[in-house]
Swiss-Prot record:
The modification Phosphothreonine is found at residue 644. GO terms for molecular function: RNA binding. Residues 529-538, 578-599 have a biased composition (Polar residues). It comes from Mus musculus. Residues 439-448 have a biased composition (Basic residues). The modification N-acetylmethionine is found at residue 1. It is found in: Cytoplasm, Stress granule; Cytoplasm, Cytosol. This is La-related protein 4.
Amino acid sequence: MLLFVEVTSKGTGLNPNAKVWQEIPSGNPDGTPVTEPSWHETAATSGSHPEGHTELSEDMCKEYEVMYSPSCETTRNTADVEESADGMILGPEDLSYQLYDVSGESSSAISTEDLKECLKKQLEFCFSRENLSKDLYLISQMDSDQFVPIWTVANMEEIKKLTTNTDLILEVLRSSPMVQVDEKGEKVRPSHKRCIVILREIPETTPVEEVKALFKNENCPKVISCEFAHNSNWYITFQSDTDAQQAFKYLREEVKTFQGKPIMARIKAINTFFAKNGYRLMDSSMYTQPIQTPTQYPSPVFMQPVYNPQQYSVYSLVPQSWSPSPAPYFETPLAPFPNGSFVDGFSSPGSYKTNAAAMNMGRPFPKNRVKPHFRSSSGSEHSTEGSVSLGDGPLSRSSSRIFLSERHNPTVTGQQEQTYLPKEAPILQMEQNGDFGRGRRTLFRGRRRRDDDRIPRPQPAATEAKAPTPKFDLLATNFPPLPGSSSRVPDELGLENRMSDVVKGVCREKDSEDVRVSCPVPAEDGQTDCTSAPLSISPSPPCTAEPPVLSTTQQEQDQMEDSAVPKDTLNPVAVPVSSPTATKPSPANTASPCTSNINPPRAVALQEPRKLSYAEVCQKPPKEPSPVLVQPLRELRSNAVSPTRNEENGAPEKPVEKPHEKPETRASKDHSGFRGNTIPRGAAGKIREQRRQFSHRATPQGVTRRNGKEQYVPPRSPK
């Protein structure tokens, strides 16, 4: 034998030998090559004794030596050269090892049973769940039915070491209960048969012999194994699915009881043989985590509640906190990566953002946060023009808020209007503080109130003029227009002023009835003129003051306010509404009563106030009761406002009705106009003035807030 091995090892350098190995799967189990006649002869001799290598005579060995020893030497040398040329390091040892396997295979045929046993163990291991969870190659070779070609199995290194005889491999596979061979004998797959019977409620202390004794019966097939699993469960394995079914039926129908208890049995599939998906799940758990996402998905879902509290807390603080919610959902698909900390990692950034929002309190309305800066810049520009810069920022904001109030007020009675105005005052104060000290918390509160106002206000908006409604809707519902309002002073401020005029008309039932200012304020001088020119009162049309373009000094504004103050009728022309807007040179846009439509460009604006005036007209009946209520409210506001104004401290306590009488001093005028106008008018211009005054002092805000809250506590509790 040794001599034969050596001789054949020399011959392994021949190319025909390599071809022999290539032809093994094709059904040449004996490795019989036909390329060269000499090799064919020797191979035929060896093939003629497949089981009798022990019978190989020394003559055969000598024949090998005689025939091949010289050629083997040359072929070996040439083979070495070729291998070196190819950069391969296949030494003769490897070839002899392979050849030894071939000879070993044929020699092991002597003990076929041993070979079959080894093959069976190896094949069953290859198709075991443990191996399938790691053997990606074998899984990749499976088709949709988990069938693997038998030649693929035969080519596996572990099998080749044992045998290359596909017929023998097929025979072993067919004899194994662990695998299933197709009818043609070409493919094999793991067996899905349920071969295990589970006995429940049998204590672990029960001897194995007693459990096995249950199945010792003619009607029960042979038990392959019996073992205790866990939780008083015993696994009894049978050879096949049919055996397990038969044993199960036997227990149910014949035995029925064990140890005085009814037998609780069920059939379980051998966990080694689950469907392909089962292998993939196992595989994914050990290797590919992305495939594991289905199993991991419950964990993100479970962890979601951990994240939700933050969402809700954020939501309570910030109405727009829905923005963080999408992020978690975008992140959750990534969460399946087993480290659940990833979810926590994401949530922590979210919490950080929410904290930042809580600190700034302006985050929910980032555009609003930017607004103050725009207004401050615009205010600086106005200051260069000679108008009070601080007023502009608050004016635009207040105008927007007044606009909201106006939208709501047209349908509201005078009392409600009064209650609303006090609320507006604290808001204005807050925003003044925002402009003065950039206190964003106050700004946020003001905006919050604005939102509160906005929620109910959209309903009465229907009463507004049809033309302005689109812009009003944009202002009310969409924040983007609000920042634009600062930049677009002429358009949006005009709208705001008109609205404020409407509000003025609604609230100034008592004041505006007597006098209506019809003169448009051309400029600072023009404003004085308008103050001096009261017109006959036409209560039906509310004055449509569109002075937003006017940017005048406080004196002019005061004069305007004075002129507006004498108005006792619901039709306050709201000339004072002319706010210190950036454009002084546009006097044509100054307030003009609806009756005297002096400015044709205001036709649109007039139309808007006309409808508003209609609402005012509807509200005119409450004019009479309202004067009494409005006056005390004015006094309260004047009290609150007077301390707030540092510039004009002299006139903090002056009565509201007298403001028109006080054109002498700007401070008194401003206060009077402010007091008189704040409650009834809600005019953006006056509110702006108020904001200027407030901006000088931050402390009086608390007082005004108190007054406003006290006045309208029943309707609302702004926070």
